[in-house]
Amino acid sequence: MATLEQNLQEMLQDAVEDLGCELWGIECQRVGRFMTVRLFIDKDGGVTVDDCADVSRQVSAILDVEDPIADKYNLEVSSPGLDRPLFTLPQFERYIGQDIAVHLRIPVMERRKWQGKLERIEKDMITLIVDDQEQILVFGNIQKANVVAKF
């Protein structure tokens, strides 16, 4: 069964691309009966405030017609930023050689949180270098991941 995020991704992907942006990912967060829907968009040269406004208007119109969210919700549209969340294996592949932070659904070696250099991706597994040791994590066990911004 598809998640709300997956349904929204499928529903909104083409509309966002028609506006010249990539739908990087979607996060839905429920607090009580209220939901926040966050769309992360990206494009070559960076995302502008106008891009976010255009996508927000288009997506709002689609959500008003399709009505996929039963409760009240707030729509937020933004760039993924420097510490961008990673949603798909192809997105992880773009950041091989960089530091990422990962939060797991089920602990591995009694840890849910891992941070290290993304070494490689094989099938549905990612390999991080953590304290000079390889740590292999199953993609399906990743609840949340993001690039660690270096300043």
Swiss-Prot record:
Entry keywords, A to Z: Cytoplasm, Ribosome biogenesis
Recorded GO CC terms: cytosol
Gene Ontology biological process terms from the UniProt entry: ribosomal small subunit assembly; translation
Entries under Gene3D superfamilies matching the protein: Ribosome maturation factor RimP, C-terminal domain, RimP-like superfamily, N-terminal
Keyword Lipid biosynthesis carried by entry: no
Keyword Cytoplasm: yes
Subcellular location: Cytoplasm
Family as reported in the entry's similarity comment: Belongs to the RimP family.
Purpose: Required for maturation of 30S ribosomal subunits.
Protein name from the UniProt record: Ribosome maturation factor RimP
Gene that produces this protein: rimP
